[in-house]
Structures are given as C-alpha cells and as structure tokens.
Amino acid sequence: MDRLLRLGGAMPQAAPPTDAPVVDTAEQVYISSLALLKMLKHGRAGVPMEVMGLMLGEFVDDYTVQVIDVFAMPQTGTGVSVEAVDPVFQAKMLDMLKQTGRPEMVVGWYHSHPGFGCWLSGVDINTQQSFEALSERAVAVVVDPIQSVKGKVVIDAFRLINPNMLVLGQEPRQTTSNLGHLQKPSVQALIHGLNRHYYSISINYRKNELEQKMLLNLHKKSWKDGLTLSDYNEHCSINEDTVAEMLDLAKNYNKSLEDEEKMTPEQLAIKNVGKQDPKRHLEEKVDKVMQNNIVQCLGAMLDTIVFK
C-alpha cells in the first residue's frame, strides 16, 4: 500500500527534489542526405501501404543523434499500421552491413504515413517502447511520402514521454536551447497524443560540400540527352498536333489584327488582359517545333554516320 501511495504522489517521499536534472530539449536529429533519400524512396514505393525500416547512426553526445544510413524491413503493413520488427532479419542485416564497412549501431526506426501526416498511433507507440527498452534515446521518425514535395519534406521525429514523470508530477521536458525549430503540431497529431504520450524532436540536415555537389548532379542533364532520338511515330503525331495548334493560333492572330484596326488606344491597352495572346503562343509553338525537328534530324544523321 505504501508503494502505491508513493507512486501516486500522495506521500512526501514522491515529491521530486528541486535540483534534480530534467530531460533536455536541445537535442537534435541530424539526418544525412543518403538516409533521407532512401526513406522517401522506400515510402513512395510502398504507397498506399505503410512501410518501415531501421536507422543506423550514432549518439554523438547528449544533444546530437546522427542518422547516417537506413535499411528497409520486410514487414507486412496496412494503410494505418505496420507490424513489429523481425529480430532475425535485423541481426543478419547488421552483420552484412559491418562486412561492407557500415559499423554504425541502430539509433531508431522510421515508418511512413502515406497521406495522413506525422504522428504515432497506438501500435507505433508500442513499437517505440520496445526500442526504448533497448536504448532510452531511440528515435522514431515518421515520413509522409504523399504530402512531401520538392523542397519540403513532411517528416518528424518523436520520442516517448516517461509516464512515471507525469504520475509524480514532474515536468517531462525543459527548454534550454533555441537550436533548430520544431514542426508545428497538427490537430491530428495532438489528438493522437503529441505532448502527452510522446514529444517531437527537431530535425536538421547536415550536408558537406561533396554531398551538395552530388545532390545538384542527381537529375542534371548531360549533352547526350539532347541527341536522344524519340520514337518516330510519336514524333510525327506531336508534329501534326503542333501544326494544327499553330493553324488555330494563326487564325486567331489574324482576327486580332483585324480587330485592332477598329479599337481605340484605351481598348488596345487592355485587349489581352485575361485572354490568350495568340502572337506569343504562336512564337512559342514555332520555336518548339523547330527545336524538336532539328534535334531529331541531327540525331538521325549522326546515328547514320556512326553506325553505318
């Protein structure tokens, strides 16, 4: 009975000491470019189902968690949950990664929420509890591959709040730094227990000069892309459609010239407001069809000479 009273905070022994250290919130999760790309690619491939995987990295200090790489887990998922981790596959995968020069430890796990934001469900909280039983600083990352667009990744990192702290009346966290910024919590995340059962950790992306060059060259076109031949049937149909559009634009341009002769200067100033400018569109179509045909003819001639 005494233990129950102490646990409930009804006795003086349950009061926390005033100088006791409180959990710090200055912690940041640094995710590498490779890990972020692999998480987004894995999440996009699993749509509309949830997917999950493990994050490899290191706990640099009390304020830094570095995620260097990730790998996918072969689990079955539904639209709203994923099952627990397979320990046998995890052990074999870590052994094989060590042989390839990837000795980092597991710092947490990630999973996708395709289309419904970043938060932890009841199943996710149970999975995170199993990770935090092995390491108190384990991180759960949630990524939304549907809402993520170029230049804005919808992602967030979470860690559970110790329920014993709330029972004893202690503050679960304290803010001692302004590094980084937290994601603005959504209504759905607050409904599912954000800041009650788990809290958010700020995420940062640390890139060196070589990684920036690699990312800039990821979808960069080379000189040979301009000489790639398109399918002749497709090229012919595109030419026919473009010429038909040019004919309509030429008729509209001729009609607009006739109308301009009857307009006053005030009417001429606003005649194209909110309307299609046939002259400009006609010039664009002519430039486009000339470029496509020149590249197609040049590529065909080069192929004829080279592979003769």
Swiss-Prot record:
Keywords assigned by UniProt, alphabetized: Hydrolase, Metal-binding, Metalloprotease, Protease, Proteasome, Ubl conjugation pathway, Zinc
EC code(s) of this entry: 3.4.19.-
Alphabetical list of SUPFAM superfamilies matching this protein: JAB1/MPN domain
Any Pfam family matching the protein: RPN11_C
GO-annotated molecular function: metal ion binding; metal-dependent deubiquitinase activity; proteasome binding
Key word Protease present: yes
GO process terms (BP): proteasome-mediated ubiquitin-dependent protein catabolic process
Binding site for Zn(2+): H111, H113, D124
Positions of the MPN domain: 29-164
Enzyme class: hydrolase
Residue positions of motif JAMM motif: 111-124
Organism domain of life: Eukaryota
CDD domains recorded: MPN_RPN11_CSN5 (cd08069)
One term under GO cellular component: nucleus
Function as written in the Swiss-Prot or TrEMBL entry: Metalloprotease component of the 26S proteasome that specifically cleaves 'Lys-63'-linked polyubiquitin chains. The 26S proteasome is involved in the ATP-dependent degradation of ubiquitinated proteins. The function of the 'Lys-63'-specific deubiquitination of the proteasome is unclear.
Subunit structure: Component of the 19S regulatory cap of the 26S proteasome.
Similarity comment text for this entry: Belongs to the peptidase M67A family. PSMD14 subfamily.
Name by which UniProt lists this protein: 26S proteasome non-ATPase regulatory subunit 14
Organism: Drosophila melanogaster
Gene: Rpn11
